[in-house]
């Protein structure tokens, strides 16, 4: 059986690193991208892993990432759009530079690489696009200062539904995974107790749970245009 080929963006740490490792453990061939991923101490190039440096917000990086997958592994079966940045501020304090930075990574960084990957997937008549969003787009919190992150991340589930319908005849699926607060180095240990209370099931989301959702989607060919929320039920209600 031919090994599946995946592209993972934002792969040098956190969720992206966890996904990359899990896919490699399961026999995938992976092209992993982040700005300086070749400096990573956690990932080393191998016959199954290609590292591509570059800002995914730039079209030339997206082109380079897709080309690396085709050059080294001859196809693209899975694209995991994980790259994203979170910049909390009161809405009126955001600068044009903040806006450009977040739109660049969270929107342009999704658009360009997806466009490249889907073009190759159409030639194969198969493929799967998975985007990582957040359930805070469903259930914003008072005082959280997240309006700009929500503006950029709320597009992901809607975009993937549209993509799912546009390319279903080409054998291409598109789905979304939306976690709540994830236990990554981005959150200081001192903040964990407060962050747990943001979920009705009072704990942080584990990276392994996001990996499990991805593996489920990979194994479920009739699931298309879906948004799997992993937040202990936070999206379902405002009080608990």
Give short role names for the model-derived ranges.
Residues 4, 75-76, 121-134, 169-172, ...:
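Active-site loop of short-chain dehydrogenase/reductase
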Residues 12-13:
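Conserved glycine-rich cofactor-binding loop
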Residues 75-77, 157-160, 164-182, 223-230:
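Conserved Rossmann-fold SDR core element
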Residues 90-91, 98-100, 195:
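Substrate-binding pocket helix/loop in short-chain dehydrogenase/reductase
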Residues 111, 207-230, 235:
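C-terminal substrate-recognition "lid" of short-chain dehydrogenase/reductases
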Residues 114-115, 161:
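A short, exposed helix-loop element centered on a Lys and neighboring polar residues
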Residues 130-155, 160-161, 165-169:
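Catalytic loop of short-chain dehydrogenase/reductase
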